[in-house]
């Protein structure tokens, strides 16, 4: 049995995505990329572009699980609100596509993938290249999304092992 997981690094201008398949306990890279919205467009138009492009990704890869970064409040409240809108568009489209949506904090993902919750984006990318046997990952946004997908696969495996251990 295999499971397709789509990781998403949401953004109001650039959204990264990473698709992996989990089969027989192994994580296989399927694809990764970015959805780039026209920065000159008004914000509502960018959200429409994001929805349309993300729907195409959902239709192409048909993931059972979509994993998205939890929102965090930085110094700029406007950026956090825009990120919230992008997350909403993605969650809506994921739900329409029949996928279950999971959320993880960035720090948890970094710790799960690299062993260090404060790892740099470049460190995460380097580990993923080795883990998934990739020569390059074109954009940091895409590697962040792949990290989300891989971390979810780790968490699912951990939960399955715990359930087996409890039933012994």
From Swiss-Prot:
Gene3D superfamilies: Ribonuclease H-like superfamily/Ribonuclease H. GO terms for cellular component: cytoplasm; Holliday junction resolvase complex. Keywords: Cytoplasm, DNA damage, DNA recombination, DNA repair, DNA-binding, Endonuclease, Hydrolase, Magnesium, Metal-binding, Nuclease. Its cofactor is Mg(2+). Mg(2+) 2 binds at residue 69. Homodimer which binds Holliday junction (HJ) DNA. The HJ becomes 2-fold symmetrical on binding to RuvC with unstacked arms; it has a different conformation from HJ DNA in complex with RuvA. In the full resolvosome a probable DNA-RuvA(4)-RuvB(12)-RuvC(2) complex forms which resolves the HJ. NCBIfam families: ruvC. The RuvA-RuvB-RuvC complex processes Holliday junction (HJ) DNA during genetic recombination and DNA repair. Endonuclease that resolves HJ intermediates. Cleaves cruciform DNA by making single-stranded nicks across the HJ at symmetrical positions within the homologous arms, yielding a 5'-phosphate and a 3'-hydroxyl group; requires a central core of homology in the junction. The consensus cleavage sequence is 5'-(A/T)TT(C/G)-3'. Cleavage occurs on the 3'-side of the TT dinucleotide at the point of strand exchange. This is Crossover junction endodeoxyribonuclease RuvC. The gene is ruvC.
């Amino acid at each position: 049995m295999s499971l397709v997981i789509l990781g998403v690094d949401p953004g109001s201008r650039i959204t990264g995505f990473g698709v992996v398949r989990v089969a027989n306990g192994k994580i296989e890279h399927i694809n990764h990329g970015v959805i780039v919205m026209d920065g000159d467009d008004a914000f509502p138009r960018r959200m429409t572009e994001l929805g349309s492009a993300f729907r195409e990704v959902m239709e192409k890869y048909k993931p059972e699980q979509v994993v998205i970064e939890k929102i965090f409040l930085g110094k700029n409240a406007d950026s956090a609100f825009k990120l919230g809108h992008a997350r909403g568009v993605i969650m809506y489209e994921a739900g329409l596509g029949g996928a279950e949506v999971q959320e993880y904090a960035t720090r948890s993902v970094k710790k799960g993938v690299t062993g260090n919750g404060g790892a740099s984006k470049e460190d995460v990318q380097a580990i993923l290249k080795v883990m998934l046997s990739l020569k390059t990952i074109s954009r940091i946004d895409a590697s962040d999304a792949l990290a989300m997908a891989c971390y979810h696969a780790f968490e699912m495996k951990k939960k399955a092992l715990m359930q087996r251990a409890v039933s012994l």
